[in-house]
Amino acid sequence: MSNKAEKYSQLRSMIPEMRRVKHIYFVGIGGAGMGGIAEVLVNEGYKLSGSDIAESAVTQRLAQLGATIYIGHDASQVKGMDVVVVSTAISADNPELVAAKELRIPVVRRAEMLAELMRYRHGVAVAGTHGKTTTTSLIASIYGEAERDPTFVIGGLLNSAGTNARLGHSRYLIAEADESDASFLHLQPMVSVVTNIEADHMDTYEGDLEKLKTTFVDFLHNLPFYGVAVVCIDDPIVRELIPRIGRRIVTYGFSDDADVQALDFKQTGYSCEFTVKRAGLADLRLSVNLPGEHNVLNALAAIAVATEDDIEDAAIIKALAEFQGIGRRFQQIGEFATSKGEIKLVDDYGHHPSEVAATIKAARLGWPERRLVMIYQPHRYSRTRDLYEDFVEVLSQVDCLLMLDVYAAGEAPIPGADSRALCRSIRVRGQVEPVFVASTEQLETILPEILQGGDLLLTQGAGSIGLLSRSLTESNLGFAATGKDEKNA
């Protein structure tokens, strides 16, 4: 164990029973959520190993920190482990999972390990269908600016830290709470945030929206009676659930009855300016270095959490104004000089209709003079099926649409819930003429024909499209070399 890890091994001192655990194995270690927890544990001084199907920036970073990384899953790799951590993406027949059970090695889900990290810390858990990563990142940034030195585990790359996880040396732990498999019920934080609730991951909830709602209420009731629930009152389902929440509540939003309210919103390019009204406190006029009303809501959640913890306004204002963003959350890749003129490239992770709509609205507000060209990759056949008409409506709002095939994420195809079907339905709607693109390689031929000078090109989705911005950068958006002028934001 390094001197740093020995000095600050808080988990072992807080949970003596964890001293028995020497070697931890992660199956699917390259995922953002898994990799973040793994990074905190390896920095705590635990011996750590893990596997994934491919090398990634996450696995490379963990290897540099001292973890043993295997590419590919093999039963022999879990021998001698004290505990095996698995993500929900790991199938029951995974050879490492099967071997762990045969060897009677404890198998825990990612959220259970996160719960152990949080057990004796002051935990802030951020849940909701949309906005978790951004909100968690904003809270972590404010606490960092206030010199609270938090530990954080985030589902995306926090640009200012160069990582999605960090071991702090204080009592604070700030983390995303994942409702996709209801595993957030393992967490027992001091502060819980709910950004919004929509029908998503409905297979977990047997297609029952009421079951989803009840699970969120149960999550909030994991708070101690002296904890606080910070919830977005603008969201209709959250507002509906407030009478069922038996904990102290702080609401936020644009609504007049919000405890922490945003007023006088204005977006200029990438940043938003607004006034924050809080009961019994002076109003704040501030800006957040993120676009869109949805990001103002995310900022309000962070402000509410920080205000509850008596963080000074100066730290809040500075952290939000200087926020450097998160990977793949309206990430400005650059501006490119082409034979057609300058074109701006933005990459975004949103893959639910509401997220896509918020991204489109932010782009329209920030750059109203630009034509909006979207390359979209649907994520999961089941989501496409369940939200089909919503996708048709929101994707019809761009000026030009290029549609990649569905990223299956392990699912079998569902007839009528694929990209070709979406293109047909969008075409019938008549607002935009979509172009189906069978492979990303075709984009180098298609883009120079479609793009115009001044366009905003948006790559959108949660699957393999996340790698597209790099290849587009290398090929200058498919144009022949014309003096690329990349300005990373």
Swiss-Prot record:
Gene3D superfamilies: Mur ligase, C-terminal domain, Mur-like, catalytic domain, NAD(P)-binding Rossmann-like Domain. Keywords: ATP-binding, Cell cycle, Cell division, Cell shape, Cell wall biogenesis/degradation, Cytoplasm, Ligase, Nucleotide-binding, Peptidoglycan synthesis. It is found in: Cytoplasm. Its EC number is 6.3.2.8. GO terms for biological process: cell division; cell wall organization; peptidoglycan biosynthetic process; regulation of cell shape. Disulfide bonds: none annotated. Pathway: Cell wall biogenesis; peptidoglycan biosynthesis. It is an enzyme of class 6 (ligase). One of its GO terms (molecular function) is ATP binding. It catalyses: UDP-N-acetyl-alpha-D-muramate + L-alanine + ATP = UDP-N-acetyl-alpha-D-muramoyl-L-alanine + ADP + phosphate + H(+). ATP binds at G128, T129, H130, G131, K132, T133, T134. One of its GO terms (cellular component) is cytoplasm. Belongs to the MurCDEF family. Cell wall formation. This is UDP-N-acetylmuramate--L-alanine ligase. The gene is murC.
